Amino acid sequence: MPPKARTNARRTGRRVVKKNVANGNAYIKSTFNNTIVSITDTNGAVISWASSGHVGFKGSRKSTPFAAQMAAENAARKAMDHGMKKVDVFVKGPGSGRETAIRSLQAAGLEIGSISDVTPQPHNGCRPPKRRRV
């Protein structure tokens, strides 16, 4: 079977359908290097998302609280375009952008119903990274 010829035509992806969703969930994953904010409906289908890198920060600036704030504002704005009004927040990870992201979701105009910490706790699982000696 001969290989397929490549063309320069771009595929047009799925059209963004404006959903009308009043409440959903906001998942904030804050690591030491980045912060990712995903806003879903109550079934778990992603409506909007943003990360520190997606907003325009590179390198070590992605891990700052300000970058997390910008990512949360961006995701909240996109979700509010779909009619989102109220979210339940689930926070995961040890990063520095946790509280800032929650505050900026509220400042963007989303009503926060509840805040849950869903950081996974090991029952002595993987060995952690070695301590830094600076």
Curated annotation (Swiss-Prot):
One term under GO cellular component: ribosome
Keyword Ribonucleoprotein belongs to the record: yes
Any single biological process term in GO: translation
UniProt keyword annotations, A-Z: Ribonucleoprotein, Ribosomal protein, RNA-binding, rRNA-binding
Protein biosynthesis is among the record's keywords: no
GO molecular function: rRNA binding; structural constituent of ribosome
InterPro entries: Ribosomal_uS11, Ribosomal_uS11_bac-type, Ribosomal_uS11_CS, Ribosomal_uS11_sf
Pfam family, one: Ribosomal_S11
Family per record: Belongs to the universal ribosomal protein uS11 family.
NCBIfam families xref list: PRK05309.1, uS11_bact
Known function: Located on the platform of the 30S subunit, it bridges several disparate RNA helices of the 16S rRNA. Forms part of the Shine-Dalgarno cleft in the 70S ribosome.
UniProt subunit comment: Part of the 30S ribosomal subunit. Interacts with proteins S7 and S18. Binds to IF-3.
Name used for this protein in its record: Small ribosomal subunit protein uS11
Organism, as annotated: Corynebacterium glutamicum (strain ATCC 13032 / DSM 20300 / JCM 1318 / BCRC 11384 / CCUG 27702 / LMG 3730 / NBRC 12168 / NCIMB 10025 / NRRL B-2784 / 534)
Gene name of the encoded protein: rpsK
